[in-house]
Amino acid sequence: MEAKAIARHVRVTPRKARRMVDLIRGKKATEAITILKFAPQDASLPVRKVLESAIANARVKADKAGEPFRENDLVVKETYVDEGVTLKRFRARAQGRAARINKRTSHITVVVANKEGNR
C-alpha cells in the first residue's frame, strides 16, 4: 500500500530541499525521520513534516482498508522536489539602481509504501 503527501509553496529553495530529499530516498520511514530530525539544515524541517504527513496518510489508508498498520514496515519509496513560484523582490543599490532578489519556493512530494509493495 502506498501513501503520498505533498507540500506546496514551501519557502525553501528547491536546490536545498533536494539535498535533504536525497538523504532519505529508499530508507525506512522511521530512520528517515531520525535523519531529518538531527540534520542541521533548515530545509530538513519542511521535508520531515511532509514525511510525517505521508506516514499519517498511510495509517488512515490502512485503517479504512481494515489492514494492520506497522510504521516500521514503511519505506520512503519515492520523493522529489519541484520548483514552485518565485517571488521577485528588489533591493536598493548604489546610485539609484536596484538588484533583483529571487525568493524561491518548492513543492515537496513524499511517497511511502510497505516493504512488500516496494519490491
From Swiss-Prot:
One Gene Ontology MF term: rRNA binding
Role description: This protein binds specifically to 23S rRNA; its binding is stimulated by other ribosomal proteins, e.g. L4, L17, and L20. It is important during the early stages of 50S assembly. It makes multiple contacts with different domains of the 23S rRNA in the assembled 50S subunit and ribosome. The globular domain of the protein is located near the polypeptide exit tunnel on the outside of the subunit, while an extended beta-hairpin is found that lines the wall of the exit tunnel in the center of the 70S ribosome.
Example GO BP: translation
The family this protein is said to belong to: Belongs to the universal ribosomal protein uL22 family.
NCBIfam families, alphabetized: rplV_bact (TIGR01044)
Domain of life per record: Bacteria
Record-given protein name: Large ribosomal subunit protein uL22
The organism of origin for this protein: Bifidobacterium adolescentis (strain ATCC 15703 / DSM 20083 / NCTC 11814 / E194a)
Record keywords: Ribonucleoprotein, Ribosomal protein, RNA-binding, rRNA-binding
Binding partners and assembly: Part of the 50S ribosomal subunit.
Position of the signal peptide: none
Gene Ontology cellular component annotations, sorted alphabetically: cytosolic large ribosomal subunit
PROSITE patterns: RIBOSOMAL_L22
